[in-house]
Amino acid sequence: MHRLLLYNFLVTTLIAPASISANSNKIPTYRAIYDVEYKNRSVGESEITVKKKESNDNYVFSSKSNATGFLKLIFPKTLIEVSEFSYLDNTIKPQIYSFSDSSITNSESYTISFNWEKNLVNTTINDQVISSEIQPNTLDNGTLQVALMLDMKNSVPESYTIRDDDGARVYKYTSEGEENLETPLGIIATKKLMQERQGFSHQTIIWLAKDLQFIPVRIEQFRDGKQRVVLNINSLKWLTIDD
């Protein structure tokens, strides 16, 4: 669950971009809690937070997932993703991204540092540093969600390129129409997207709240046509710089 749940949470994009039009240039800051199901069983919760830093104009996206029940024995620690990024001239630029997972069956962590002056990234895994080139507008798994929320104020993006420990990934999006969802927050009008990676059997359906800054309120992940992971929003709080 660990990798499927957060790597692909909103998972995860350059053709239509992290460059946002001027009338959509405010980044929502918030905290959302999601209930997580795996193969139709409740397995934990995930907390997504986007905050603005006090010290500079950067923002921080963080995602924390905790297992419950019997899975707590296998995944006793919190799975954490953190992305610090800048947002200037309507462009999102990741600065540093980290992923940490320590479970009984798997222990993995890595860090990606972005050098936009040289268009390079340094990926650190187990004290080994790998440098590689990146294209403009490349995102990470955290800034992907932020870019998607901003772009959806205008239209459905065609694709995004993200960088993770496996290199560059391109995800494509298609509209699946609109749907009203019943949630703990009430009935929410959503736009429904399909996310796919070419050549892979994974698919993700995302419901984005039209009147809540396009925050995702439901995510379903499929593998080989079978539903695997479902995230449903449970609570939402808008944040200020003092929170």
Task: Report the location of each language-model feature.
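Hydrophobic, well-structured mid-protein blocks that either form specific transmembrane helices
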Residues: S103-A147
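N-terminal signal peptide c-region/cleavage motif recognized by signal peptidases
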Residues: A16-S19
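Acidic, serine/threonine-rich low-complexity disordered tracts
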Residues: A22-W116, M152-D243
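Intrinsically disordered, low-complexity regions
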Residues: H2-R3, D127, S131, S159
